[in-house]
Amino acid sequence: MVGKTSKKSASVAKKTVSKRSTAKPKLLTGGNPQIAKADGDAPVQAYIAAMPGWKRDVGRRLDALIVSTVPSVRKAVKWNSPFYGIEDQGWFLGIHCLTKYIKVAFFRGTSLSPVPPVESKQKEVRYFHIHEDDVIDEAQFAEWVNQASQLPGERI
């Protein structure tokens, strides 16, 4: 039997692999998708695809606005949230799903003009919350993204 796999073991292994590849991401508290930490566009797109309900379309639109504003943007998923940054400058923005809204964090938000509306406990961070029925001012959002991308980013 050396070097051989029993039929039962091979069958169990196949089932385990197929379950992993077809499993949908788990939604954490507030409906935030659980996506493994990774760099690049693919994990960010997996996060967006796993965003529940109305948040998915908003996530796609935010991602498109960020990419069109900063074509050289660097992407990653860290701590179950997409991060956007500039190579060798750090991260300037993060997105997180909560029960009733999407939270966009501008890590140097107090340096933006106008300052995004929601305060943070962290000195420089400001948030922009998007609720289901909100109309996003895309020009303002793109301007924040443009300004944020030119500031020193967070080293995370």
Question: Could you tell me what each predicted segment is?
Answer:
Residues V2-I156:
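Charge-dense, helix-prone N-terminal extensions
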